[in-house]
Amino acid sequence: MKKVLLFSSLFLLSTLMVFAYETIIIKFPDRENWVKAYYKKVGLEAILQYVPAGQGSNNWTKSVVVHSYNQSTYPISVFLTNSTAKLLKANPTAGYKTLRLTDNDAIVGRCTKNYGKIQAQCEIFRVTRGYEGIVTIHYMNKDKDDFMENYNQWYNIIKRAKLYNSYYRDERMLDKAEYFEL
């Protein structure tokens, strides 16, 4: 009887993992109204953008972008290096500082200057290993003074963004955090 119970339990747990979907929870500042400006899932990639209320996906001063790359097996350091190379190609004025680097998670701070038609911005960029691949989380701000003034708050928000597997599509968070399917 114990073997049947054990087998049934293992089967149930493995079945639940198949039907789970990866989500992310981001807790935005309490007194700021951030809204979803863009979400698209195509194949193995999903991208989500949040902006302050009244701004849009192409017209923003601050933005949080989450991009998931399901089944991506790159080492975090390689993914970060490739991302930085793309940024430098688009805007060679970029400077960055590695703030945290482990095998499964990295955070860098970086700023650019105006370059051609590209407006200057500063960002906190996190690359993390999820359950199903790699997830990047960007906080971007086009106002360097505001970025520096609120740096610690946003560093902690991005650092504390949490990935987890959800088993119910109508699951609700008990706090004010935002979440979406990756």
For each feature predicted by the language model, list its residue ranges.
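Sec-dependent N-terminal signal peptides
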Residues: V4-T15
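Secretory pathway targeting signatures of secreted, lumenal, and periplasmic proteins
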Residues: E32-S72
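Signature of long, low-cysteine stretches enriched in small and polar/charged residues
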Residues: L88-T128
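Sec/Tat signal peptide C-region and signal peptidase I cleavage site
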Residues: L16-A20
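Short conserved aromatic/hydrophobic patches within beta-strands of well-structured domains
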Residues: T23-K40, A161
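Mid-chain, structured segments of secreted extracytoplasmic proteins
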Residues: K62-D105
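Surface-exposed amphipathic alpha-helical segments
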Residues: T136-L182
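Short, surface-exposed coil-to-beta transition loops
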Residues: Y21, E45-L48, G116-F125, N150
